Amino acid sequence: MPALLLCSIVALTTSFYIRGVIEIWIGSFELNDDIALALYSPYDWYTMRWSFSILFGVIISFPLLCLGFYRFMESGLLSTEKRSIRSLFLVISFIIPMGVSIIVALNPIVASAVASSDRIEGVVTKIDPISIVEFSLSASWVFTVFTLLVCTLTTTRILISDDEIGASIRVRFHLIFAALLFVAMSNDFRGLRAIIIFASAVVSDALSKRLAQLFFGIYRG
């Protein structure tokens, strides 16, 4: 609850000052003389403004969210499990904000490079920042959901030793996070949704197995 409240407060506060951040972000587009930015309507501007505000709120409040989850679970954990999950949550709480920041920072550079390398002579190329924002947000949420899935599966493997019960629970988590991934992806990912969801399931399952062995093995032995 405190994390959600902090996210809301940060998003609301940031919305009043986000214009400067957006100007810096737009300035990161490396444009040639024959490439321009296009913003189609006031609605697009407000969409961009609030999208940035909400994303910034999530980045700021995510470590607090991880702390809240850990405190909720702490009373029912053994000492070895506490150390393992505390280390896992600590890593995750920094990976997601860093990953989202990198995705948002790199997208304008990549978009500018693509627009510069693939254009028709005599035709002015226009980059739509709204599409870049939508792609950035979708990519950020895909990364966030994937990382949370890895964290959830790793936690399940650490806490549940019974393979049959653990496998059943992990399948349910896969289905839940597959639905979240489907919703998180914008139309820019049309045609890739099934591939991304399947790849996320396979990679997250393998990665969670290795992480559970790593974190639990360190503190157990």
What residues fall within each predicted segment?
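Membrane topogenic/interface segments and analogous intrinsically disordered interaction regions
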Residues: M1-G221
